Design a protein with these regions (language model features):
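Conserved N-terminal subdomain of the carbohydrate kinase-like
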Residues: 2-9, 29-112, 268
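N-terminal phosphate-binding or glycine-rich loops at protein starts, especially the Walker A/P-loop
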Residues: 6-30
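Short pre-catalytic strand/loop immediately N-terminal to key active-site residues, enriched for Gly-Thr
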Residues: 10-16, 197-211
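Short, small-residue alpha-helix embedded
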Residues: 22, 146, 207-231
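Phosphate-handling active-site elements
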Residues: 32-36, 197-198, 224-237
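Charged C-terminal helix
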Residues: 55, 232-273
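Conserved phosphate/ATP/ADP-binding segment of small-molecule kinases
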Residues: 120-196
Length: 273
């Protein structure tokens, strides 16, 4: 039996399974890679919102990461909810040491419910500590506005934001996601690399059940990079994956429910491996 590719997620929890490391691990599995996880925060949340957040002391994150890296190196890693500057600095230390491992950053600032998931000090230091090491960053429109400091309301401003990520912040790639745009029919994502710009379009589905879409999207990109896929191929797969997961949402919970992390595997299978 061939040894599987390994993807590591560093993020918070979701007891209902829709977001955070729970969503990441399901997405890794659906992409055919072995998932590992290091927890940053214990989050009491459900489809109705966030009830409580307990951020772990940063040394607990360092202990978990050392447990992973001293035993088996991941082929790619991603970060989601990183609550503090101290945690960012620990992650940066590993990114510097293992700079050949692809790194995907989902710059999670708010939950779908609107609850804040990152303190102000962490927000202020995100682009200095972690984003310069990103193989691909995956901000939605509000996150891209927060990071770049510009208002994004048309294609020109999207290109301006992409240029800031690549040429000023130093990320190798960035996907600016269009899920928060006013387009009611199409969801368009823009991938900026150091050489090119690509667009990815999928239908927009009329559903409130989109909890964990950002986590899932970035996890699929991470899984594909772990398998050695290009940025373009990884994002293309993630876009189709998230579109199908929204189309076939299981409608779980009383509020904004999760997506279906296994819809792609059931509809397309693993025939692209």
């Amino acid at each position: 039996m061939n040894k599987p590719k390994i993807a590591l997620t560093i993020a918070g929890t979701d007891p209902t399974g829709g977001a955070g490391v729970m969503a990441d691990l399901k997405s890794f599995h659906a992409c055919g890679v072995y998932g590992m996880a290091a927890i940053t925060s214990i989050v009491a949340q459900n489809t109705k919102g966030v009830q409580h957040i307990h951020n772990l002391d940063s040394h607990w994150l360092e202990e978990q990461m050392e447990s992973v890296f001293s035993d088996e190196l991941p082929h790619a890693l991603k970060t989601g909810m990183i609550a503090s500057k101290e945690m960012m600095e620990i992650i940066q230390m590993y990114l510097k040491k293992y700079d050949n491992i692809p790194y995907v950053i989902d710059p999670v600032m708010l939950a779908k419910s609107g609850d804040s998931l990152m303190d102000d000090d962490a927000k202020a230091n995100l682009q200095n500590i972690l984003l310069p090491y990103a193989t691909i960053a995956t901000p939605n429109l509000p996150e891209a506005e927060e990071i770049t400091g510009i208002t994004i309301n048309d294609q020109q401003s999207i290109y301006q934001a992409g240029n800031i990520f690549i040429n000023e912040i130093g990320s190798k790639g960035v996907v600016i996601k269009g899920g928060h745009s006013s387009d009611k029919n199409t969801a368009i994502d823009y991938l900026f690399t150091q050489d090119d710009v690509f667009t990815f379009e999928e239908p927009r589905y009329d559903t409130k059940h989109t909890h964990g879409t950002g986590c899932t999207f970035s996890a699929v990109i991470t899984a594909e990079l772990a398998k050695g896929k290009s940025m373009f191929d990884a994002v293309q797969k993630a876009k189709k994956f998230i579109s199908l997961s929204i189309k076939h949402t299981p409608e779980i919970g009383l509020g904004r429910g999760p997506v279906n992390h296994f819809a792609y595997m059931k509809e397309v299978g693993l025939d692209d491996e």
